[in-house]
Amino acid sequence: MITVKLYGLLRIESGIKQKQLEAESVQQVLDVLCALGISQKDLKGCTILVNGNSVTKRSKLKDGDTVVLMSPVAGG
C-alpha cells in the first residue's frame, strides 16, 4: 500500500489530504488522482517526492512508500 499526501492547491481543490492506494509507479498514482477528479493540468506542474526524494513520473514504487505531491508556489 502506498500513502499519497497532497499539499497546496492540490489539497484545497481536491479535498484530499491523504489517500492510501495500490500503485507500482508514480504515473499510476497520477492516473488514480485524475480518476478522482484532479485535472492533469494541476498535476503536471506539481513537485513529486517519494520518501522525501525528488522523482519523476516514471519512478517505481514499493509497498510502504510515501508519495508527496505539492502544487507550485506563486506569489511575491
Over which residues does each language-model region extend?
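Ubiquitin-like/PB1-type beta-grasp interaction modules and other compact soluble beta-rich domains
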Residues: 1-74
